[in-house]
UniProtKB/Swiss-Prot annotation:
InterPro entries: AB_hydrolase_fold, CarbesteraseB, Carboxylesterase_B_AS, Carboxylesterase_B_CS
Name of the protein described by the UniProt record: cAMP-regulated D2 protein
Compartments reported by the entry: Cytoplasmic vesicle, Esterosome membrane
Position of the signal peptide: 1-20
Species of provenance: Dictyostelium discoideum (Social amoeba)
Amino acid sequence: MNKLLVFILLLLLLINISFARKRSYIKNTDASIVVTQFGAIKGIVEDTHRVFYGVPFAQPPVNQLRWENPIDLKPWENVRETLTQKSQCAQKCNLGPGVCSPIGTSEDCLYLDVFTPKDATPNSKYPVIVYIPGGAFSVGSGSVPLYDATKFAQSSVIVVNINYRLGVLGFMGTDLMHGNYGFLDQIKALEWVYNNIGSFGGNKEMITIWGESAGAFSVSAHLTSTYSRQYFNAAISSSSPLTVGLKDKTTARGNANRFATNVGCNIEDLTCLRGKSMDEILDAQEKVGLTFGDKILDAFTIWSPVIDGDIIPMQPLTAVKEGKTYDVPTIIGNVKHEAIPFIYSFFQDSVGIDYYRVLVAIVFPLNAMKILPLYPAAPRGQDSRPILSELITDYLFRCPDRYHTVTNAKKLSSPTYHYHYVHVKSTGHSLDACDDKVCHGTELSLFFNSYELMGERLDNDEKELAIDINNYIVNFATTHNPNTGLDVPVQWRQVTSTQNSTLILETTIETKDTFTNDPKCNALDLTYYRNQVRP
């Protein structure tokens, strides 16, 4: 009996030691484990922050789920490792190192990355930024070095970078398909963040959506959609090509028919379409061409969300005009030479005076004679691409941004802030035409403070500018006022019905009235931006 008692006591002791070790292990790694509504995940705890790479937010949209709305995940039992980034969504990425994913490309791509402060707990209530990457709705990924959000996490903000289906897989609209699968992916990611970010230490009542380029265009669409509104309460739109407009059903259907012909399927035969490989899909997508005429600007985004009257009820710029956008604090901005990369990619040879005038007449069939004196062609024998770039920058980005900002100030109660980024980085650019220019996307490595990961060597003034930009964004995400919280060099005044103020982002930051007495934007306003804001 004594021997049996001793044995039992020893056994209990061993069990207790084992259990204690297990509890100790859980305690020591607790910061790396977060329990979501679908199961536990394990991330990485760095010295200054935590990061969870490749967190799934929907079932993989493959096989029978290709061209279907995103579907909720199935729960899992064991702790799922989220230690490495996942593939970018199906695409032929041409954005260069640090912007194209080194992991590869896959249709199984509905994942997101979460960056949090190191000390975040479920009680922290840190503000949240959800970042929607750009890339003309055809390329791009949130899981790349450019969007590394370490600096934001170190500044007490949680950042979630998302992926969504691109190109024809995300935005093919037909009589049977609404064409907003990639947009619904974004909404599914926002829903996931809203439902789960509290477990990471975030405040679901303080979620800011932010996007650049097509990501900013997406932000504008979310501001019109009743499907999105409950999942965020502030917005940042960086370099949105609002004038291009989202696709109407007719244009979307035409692009879909050309794609189906290229891939060898009837547009209504989903079995055939789903039977094609990813590479076959991408090859056929690449061959989809556009006719010129008044649709020339659609070349900027061959594939995009579709105005279906339900998920997206109207063009974002029309919603702005009618005061039908979500009334939330908003930052709107752009860079100085947005259109140069597009113009010099589309027109690789010099554009002469006659060709330039034809292009202006195509884009502005009713207003060309009013536009040409403001944007005169270069003398005969010289290249008119520089002035064409200025015109398209103003028409697609700068002037509709002005319209958006001023109209918000008149129609909405929430504050709107405007910025214009003009700093020429000391590091080079991959496109020769962008040397000594501020091209589309060039600001992002400063906005994210990811310049070292991008191999850029900035001088001290530029590093200080990056910190100042970080502080403005952190303050806005935290308080909805970019001036309250972390130190900023200049008070960024909101635009009101009586005050036009733009924050000029240069190594010496200042504010200016860039809206009043602008004859170019005044003239472009009268084109009604492709009839999106006609009186």
